[in-house]
């Protein structure tokens, strides 16, 4: 995993089961790459009684500045199986709020679509929370393609929200082939003009799907590239 992560300046992580596991990853990054890495983990795990996970971020200290935590989305309506979590960062001149969400999988797409339809509330919460910051990125495993109609409420928002990663790119790893396009990063076309339009996923499988999903991850990391020489807030 460290060999894959080293390609990025800042990485959002989900399905972090223990803080100790994250610490081991950061130690590996510091040992095997030419950069010094730091991390931030959510103060507690979220999920169900049977399964909970942390959200986390890791970054290159010479490239990225961690500004502050925005905390969890206050899910008073119980809309999400795992409340999304946000934190503020700066890379070069570009500062932004990076929100992570790991959506429900559930028993049917109906459950997943119900969460996706409410994602606009998460965007609006973090957008309204910090009056000085307009760049809100929402990344994660949404267990749906960004083409799905359930994201229509997000796309219809006045801030012109778009997906950053082409949904035709499959990001989940099956036993014998790539399976689904579940991972993406949503952002505002209106505000985040720093987005270059370049994005994708790093395929580390070498077609060894079963081995890699068991030893590394069953998801490919997705990414967007932004211009860090400007900030339009």
Predicted regions and their residues:
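His/acidic metal-ligating clusters that form di-metal
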Residues: 113-139
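Structured beta-strand-rich core segments of catalytic domains in phosphoester-bond hydrolases
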Residues: 17-94
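Metal-dependent phosphoester-hydrolase catalytic domains
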Residues: 19, 124-134, 144-233
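Loop/turn elements at helix/coil->beta-strand transitions in domains of secreted/extracellular proteins
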Residues: 6-10, 33-38, 92-97, 131-136, ...
């Amino acid at each position: 995993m460290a060999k894959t992560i080293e390609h990025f300046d800042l990485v959002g992580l989900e399905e972090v089961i223990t803080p100790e596991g994250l610490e081991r990853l950061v130690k590996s990054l510091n040992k095997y790459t030419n950069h010094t890495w730091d991390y931030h983990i959510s103060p507690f795990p979220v999920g169900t009684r049977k399964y909970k996970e942390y959200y986390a971020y890791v970054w290159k200290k010479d490239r990225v500045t961690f500004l502050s935590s925005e905390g969890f989305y206050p899910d008073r309506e119980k809309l999400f199986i795992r409340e999304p979590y946000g934190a503020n960062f700066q890379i070069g001149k570009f500062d932004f709020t990076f929100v992570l969400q790991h959506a429900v999988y559930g028993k049917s797409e109906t459950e997943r679509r119900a969460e996706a339809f409410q994602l606009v509330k998460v965007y609006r919460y973090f957008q309204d929370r910090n009056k000085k910051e307009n760049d809100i990125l929402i990344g994660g495993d949404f267990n749906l393609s960004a083409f799905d109609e359930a994201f229509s409420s997000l796309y219809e928002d006045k801030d012109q929200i778009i997906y950053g990663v082409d949904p035709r790119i499959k990001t989940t790893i099956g036993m014998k082939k790539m399976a689904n396009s579940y991972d993406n990063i949503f952002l505002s076309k209106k505000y985040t003009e720093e987005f270059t339009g370049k994005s994708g996923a790093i395929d580390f499988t070498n077609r060894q799907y079963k081995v890699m999903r068991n030893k590394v991850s069953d998801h490919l990391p997705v990414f967007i590239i932004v211009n860090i020489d400007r900030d339009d807030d």
